[in-house]
């Protein structure tokens, strides 16, 4: 995972839609089965803003921004179906969104503005990672194992996560939609 450097007095955050149970357990198990070294560090999610470093004193303004974004967005439904990959550009296999793509795109654009504005490394494509930076055989196995996967859930909030010194991403604040 490409993580921006963090200095003393800074925090590394990410913004994401949490995948609810029982689906989170399924997706975590798939990532563990792929022997992804980050399987236990990153809960299943749909990224809205990748790892971003802020001065700790900017966090309150960032949370105000996120609250305004969330308040302006209605709840929506996500349907996950099947697998796809970013190969050969990036060694990632993911479960794809079949519904909720445009809503995620709109949320991502709104989140990635103002105090959280910045350039993207890749074009935004909402997904749930199940294997990342593992050997090709493990990527292929993850792709095949979850190819028939399907789940549907309502999204009524997103979360601000913080990357701890122990390498674990933990939710810090919830932002209800609508």
Please state what every model-predicted region is:
Residues 1-77, 85, 100-157, 170-178:
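Basic, often amphipathic N-terminal segments
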Residues 77-80, 87-92:
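Structural motif corresponding to the early beta-alpha repeats
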Residues 88-89, 135, 165:
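Short strand-connecting beta-turns/loops that link adjacent beta-strands
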Residues 90-98, 104:
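Charge-rich, low-complexity N-terminal segments
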Residues 97, 163, 177:
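Active-site donor-binding loop signature of nucleotide-sugar glycosyltransferases
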Residues 156-166:
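Short beta-strand segments and strand-loop junctions that repeat across beta-rich extracellular domains
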């Amino acid at each position: 995972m490409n993580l921006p450097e963090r200095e003393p007095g800074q925090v590394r955050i990410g913004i994401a839609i949490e995948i609810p149970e029982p689906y989170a357990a399924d997706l975590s198990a798939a990532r563990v089965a792929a022997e992804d070294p980050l399987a236990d560090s990153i809960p299943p999610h749909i990224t809205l803003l990748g790892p971003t470093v802020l001065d700790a004193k900017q966090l309150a303004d960032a949370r105000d921004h996120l609250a305004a974004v969330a308040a302006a967005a209605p709840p929506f439904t996500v349907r996950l179906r099947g697998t796809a990959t970013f190969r050969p550009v990036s060694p990632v296999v993911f479960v794809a969104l079949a519904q909720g793509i445009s809503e995620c795109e709109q949320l991502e654009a709104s989140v990635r503005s103002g105090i959280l504005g910045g350039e993207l490394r890749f074009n935004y494509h909402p997904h749930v990672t199940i294997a990342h930076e593992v050997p090709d055989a493990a990527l292929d196995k993850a792709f095949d194992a979850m190819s028939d996967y399907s789940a549907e859930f309502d999204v009524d909030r997103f979360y601000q996560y913080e990357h701890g010194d122990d390498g674990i991403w933990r939710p810090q604040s919830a932002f209800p939609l609508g």
